[in-house]
Curated annotation (Swiss-Prot):
Classification of source organism: Bacteria, Pseudomonadati, Pseudomonadota, Betaproteobacteria, Burkholderiales
Protein name: Peptide chain release factor 1
SMART domains in UniProt: PCRF (SM00937)
Domain of life of the native organism: Bacteria
Post-translational modification (record): Methylated by PrmC. Methylation increases the termination efficiency of RF1.
Molecular function, one GO term: translation release factor activity, codon specific
Annotated GO CC locations: cytoplasm
Protein purpose: Peptide chain release factor 1 directs the termination of translation in response to the peptide chain termination codons UAG and UAA.
Family listed: Belongs to the prokaryotic/mitochondrial release factor family.
A Pfam entry, by short name: RF-1
Keywords, comma-separated and alphabetical: Cytoplasm, Methylation, Protein biosynthesis
């Protein structure tokens, strides 16, 4: 292990002891914001310090066994102990290196997941519905909570656009690599000749702002329109102007919400989605600046970037960013995304490790 890494781990061990002391103080526990911030830091540091303690134990075991080498009757035992201790040190050292990688500050946030039908008309809208079901099934497997924020249904089923809020542990960290273009190749239900059609949807995964105030929105920059909610095909489903459209004039971002009968609730939801979209836009602008110096294999999360192809006749999914092909499309469409997400996270970690190596 590098001296710089060991020094960092020693600092974290000291910091954890400080946090234990702080969290037992009454003036800290009475300040909810401060207490929440410190408990979050404590939860992050705990596993790292625990791993480091195991690494030091393995190092001490190796040192103790080294002393036994001088005794001929103990040499075989000592060599085996040294080998086992060094194996543990290597394994724990690699895990610690990953644990020390810079954390995305948004990783623990809830998300807004937005799916938009793209090229392909009705078939694209049907695929948007299939993608939504895939993510909802994955959310179910993770025991996450899902709330429908806005939906524009198409005539044949599926969605022209749909936005859901997903709340739960590590929602953003697991789904953040889903942003981009998703292409489908299959025979549509409406196709009589059996020809394979290609259509596409775009997915955007946006971290939820902790509070709307976290993103500065000047009320003077907003135009709020109310209108009558409508269902698929344009038929009116509500006789009051409960639907809300919020336009953020400086960015041109528009959010519509009409899923609730209450205008107040629709406005509240629209403002939450707007805050997330503005935050997402700011993040992408920052990432674009960084991408100018280092191109990420995982990609920029740009919606125009095609990231994945779903080929139904072959039962094949291909993620173009990491050249991964899986022949288990049915299971994936049923929400079994663990293998795919693990591969993307692993590639991202490898990139971060490589960039840290370059920095050294």
């Amino acid at each position: 292990m590098k001296t710089s890494m060991q020094r960092k781990l020693d600092q974290l061990t000291t910091r954890l002891a400080e946090l234990n002391d702080l969290l037992s103080r009454e003036d800290i526990t009475s300040n909810l914001d401060q207490y929440r911030k410190l408990t979050r830091e404590h939860a992050e540091l705990g596993p790292v310090v625990e791993h480091y303690a195991l690494w030091r134990q393995a190092m001490n075991d190796a040192a103790t066994a080294q002393e036994l080498l001088a005794d001929a009757s103990m040499r075989d035992f000592a060599e085996e102990e040294i080998r086992a201790a060094r194996e543990r040190m290597d394994k724990l050292g690699a895990e610690l290196q990953k644990m020390l990688l810079p954390k995305d500050p948004n990783d623990d946030r809830n998300i807004f997941l937005e799916i938009r039908a793209g090229t392909g008309g009705d078939e694209s809208a049907l695929f948007a519905g299939d993608l939504l079901r895939m993510y909802l099934r994955y959310a179910e497997r993770n025991r996450w909570q899902v709330e429908m924020m806005s939906a524009s249904e198409s005539d044949l089923g599926g969605y022209k656009e749909v936005i859901v809020r997903i709340a739960g542990e590590a929602a953003y960290s697991k789904l953040k690599f889903e942003s981009g273009g998703h292409r489908v190749q299959r025979v549509p239900a409406t196709e009589t000749q059996g020809r394979i059609h290609t259509s596409a949807c775009t997915v955007a995964v946006m971290p939820e702002a902790d509070e709307i105030g976290e993103v500065e929105i000047n009320p003077a920059d907003l135009r709020i329109d109310t209108f009558r909610a409508s269902g698929a095909g344009g038929q009116h489903i509500n006789k009051t102007d409960s639907a809300v459209r919020v336009t953020h004039l400086p960015t041109g971002i528009v959010v519509e919400c009409q899923d609730d009968r209450s205008q107040h609730k629709n406005k509240d939801r629209a403002l939450k989605v707007l805050a997330a979209r503005i935050k997402d836009k700011q993040s992408h602008e920052q990432q674009a600046k960084e991408a100018a110096t280092r191109k990420s294999l995982i990609g920029s999360g740009d919606r125009s970037e095609r990231i994945r192809t779903y080929n139904f006749p072959q039962g094949r999914l291909t993620d173009h960013r990491i050249n991964l092909t899986l022949y288990r499309l049915d299971a994936i469409m049923d929400g079994d995304l663990d293998e795919l997400i693990a591969a993307l996270v692993s590639e991202h970690q490898a990139e971060l490790l490589a960039s840290l190596g370059d920095a050294d």
